[in-house]
C-alpha cells in the first residue's frame, strides 16, 4: 500500500510532516486480541522499545517470548523482570550479535527448533560515533547492524516462518523490521554502487548514516516482499518515531546527551506509547501492509526517491549488491525458492 501513496511522500519529508507524525494520537488495539499459544521473537529486547513491546505482547497473553539480545547477562536481568510479572509465560533469552554474520546465522538456525513462530520484531539497531568498521566483515557498523545483518536475518527467517505456519490459523506469521522516518530526510547517491558509499569515512555523519541505513532497509523490504506471498508470511517496516526513555544514544558526550534530552522532552513519545507502533504493525495492519512502511498507527508512503525511475534503479542495484554480499548463505536461492514454492 505504501506504493500507492506517492502524493503524500513530499509532505512526509518536511518539518511539518515530522511534527504531524510526532503528535499523532495513538490508536488503541482492537479489543479481543489474544496471543495465547503464540510464539514471538523480539531482538534488542532487553531495554527500551524492544523491552516495552515484549511486555505488551505478554500482556496480550503471549505464551512464549524469545528475547534476542547481545548480552546474556543483560538479557537475563530483563527476562527476570518479565517472568515476575508474567509467571505463566515461557521467556527465553537467546544471543544474537548483529555485528556478526555467524551469530545471526546461529540465531536463525536455533529458530528452526521452535514448533511455531507467529511474530518477529527485528528491533536491534544502533546509531554510533565515531566511524567504526566491523573487523570480521569490513563493513561500517551502522550499515552492518541496521541493514546487512538485518537483511540476512530476514532472509533466513522467512522460509522458517513459512514452513512453521499453522494450518489451523487464519492469520499469517509476520516479520516487522524496525525502521525510521529519518529515511525521509536522507538520500544516498543515485549513481554507482550503493553499499560502498558507507565505506567513505570522510563523509561520515552518525545521524545521516543512520537515516540512510533505514532508507536502504525500506528499499530492501519493499523488494523482498515481491518474493513472498503475504498469505505465507507478512513482512513490513514499523517506525516508532522519536522516542524518549531509551538507551539509544548511550555513549554520547554529556553535552550532546543534554541537548538530545531537551529535544526529546519537547517532541519525543514515551517509550510505551512508541512501542505500540510495533504491535500495530504485527497485529493490526494486516495484508495491506505487506512490503510497506508503517508509522503512527497507519501505513505511510515510501521516501520520495522510491517513486522515481532513478529510485527504482537504485533499489535494483541495492538488491543485487545485497544478494552478492549475503550469498555466502545462498541468499539468492533462498529468496527465489520462496517465490517458486
Swiss-Prot record:
Residue numbers annotated as active site: 210 (proton donor), 214 (lowers pka of active site tyr)
Similarity annotation: Belongs to the short-chain dehydrogenases/reductases (SDR) family.
Binding site for NADP(+): 49, 74, 97, 123, 210, 214
Task of the protein: Short chain dehydrogenase; part of the gene cluster that mediates the biosynthesis of virensols and trichoxide, fungal natural products that contain or are derived from a salicylaldehyde core. The pathway begins with the synthesis of the reduced chain in virensol C by the highly reducing polyketide synthase virA via condensation of one acetate and 8 malonate units. VirA has interesting programming rules since the first 2 ketides are fully reduced, the 3 following ketides undergo beta-dehydration, and the last 3 ketides are only reduced to beta-hydroxys to yield the trihydroxy portion.
Signal peptide segment: none
Keywords, sorted A to Z: NADP, Oxidoreductase
Name of the molecule in the record: Short chain dehydrogenase virL
Top EC category: oxidoreductase
PANTHER family: DEHYDROGENASE_REDUCTASE FAMILY PROTEIN, PUTATIVE-RELATED, PHOSPHATIDYLINOSITOL-GLYCAN BIOSYNTHESIS CLASS F PROTEIN-RELATED
Annotated metabolic or biological route of this protein: Secondary metabolite biosynthesis
Gene of this entry: virL
Classification lineage: Eukaryota, Fungi, Dikarya, Ascomycota, Pezizomycotina
GO function term, MF aspect, one: oxidoreductase activity
Domain of life: Eukaryota
EC number: 1.1.1.-
Pfam families: adh_short
Amino acid at each position: 500500500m505504501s506504493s500507492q501513496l506517492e502524493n503524500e511522500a513530499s509532505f512526509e519529508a518536511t518539518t511539518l510532516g515530522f511534527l504531524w507524525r510526532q503528535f499523532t494520537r495513538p490508536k488503541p488495539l482492537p479489543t479481543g486480541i489474544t496471543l495465547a499459544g503464540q510464539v514471538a521473537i523480539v531482538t534488542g529486547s532487553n531495554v527500551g522499545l524492544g523491552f516495552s513491546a515484549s511486555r505488551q505482547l505478554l500482556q496480550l497473553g503471549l505464551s512464549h517470548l524469545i528475547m534476542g539480545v547481545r548480552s546474556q547477562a543483560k538479557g537475563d536481568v530483563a527476562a527476570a523482570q518479565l517472568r515476575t510479572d508474567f509467571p505463566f509465560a515461557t521467556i527465553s533469552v537467546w544471543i544474537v550479535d548483529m555485528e556478526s554474520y555467524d551469530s545471526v546465522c546461529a540465531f536463525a538456525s536455533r529458530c528452526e527448533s521452535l514448533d511455531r513462530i507467529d511474530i518477529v520484531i527485528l528491533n536491534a539497531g544502533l546509531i554510533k560515533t565515531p566511524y567504526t568498521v566491523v573487523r570480521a566483515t569490513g563493513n561500517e557498523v551502522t550499515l552492518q547492524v541496521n541493514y546487512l545483518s538485518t537483511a540476512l536475518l530476514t532472509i533466513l527467517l522467512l522460509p522458517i516462518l513459512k514452513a512453521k505456519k499453522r494450518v489451523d490459523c487464519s492469520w499469517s506469521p509476520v516479520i516487522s523490521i524496525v525502521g525510521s522516518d529519518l529515511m525521509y530526510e536522507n538520500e544516498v547517491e543515485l549513481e554507482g554502487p550503493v553499499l560502498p558509499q558507507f565505506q567513505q569515512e570522510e563523509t561520515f555523519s552518525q545521524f545521516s548514516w543512520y537515516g540512510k541505513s533505514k532508507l536502504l532497509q525500506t528499499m530492501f523490504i519493499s523488494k523482498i516482499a515481491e518474493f513472498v506471498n503475504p498469505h505465507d508470511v507478512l513482512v513490513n517496516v514499523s517506525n516508532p518515531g522519536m522516542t524518549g526513555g531509551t538507551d539509544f544514544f548511550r555513549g554520547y558526550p554529556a553535552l550532546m546527551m543534554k541537548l538530545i534530552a531537551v529535544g526529546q522532552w519537547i517532541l519525543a513519545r514515551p517509550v510505551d506509547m512508541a512501542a505500540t507502533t510495533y504491535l500495530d504493525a504485527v497485529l493490526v495492519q494486516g495484508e495491506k501492509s505487506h512490503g510497506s512502511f508503517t508509522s503512527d498507527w497507519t501505513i505511510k508512503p515510501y521516501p520520495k526517491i522510491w517513486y522515481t525511475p532513478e529510485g527504482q534503479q537504485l533499489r535494483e542495484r541495492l538488491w543485487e549488491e545485497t544478494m552478492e554480499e549475503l550469498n555466502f548463505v545462498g541468499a539468492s536461492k533462498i529468496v527465489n525458492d520462496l517465490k517458486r514454492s
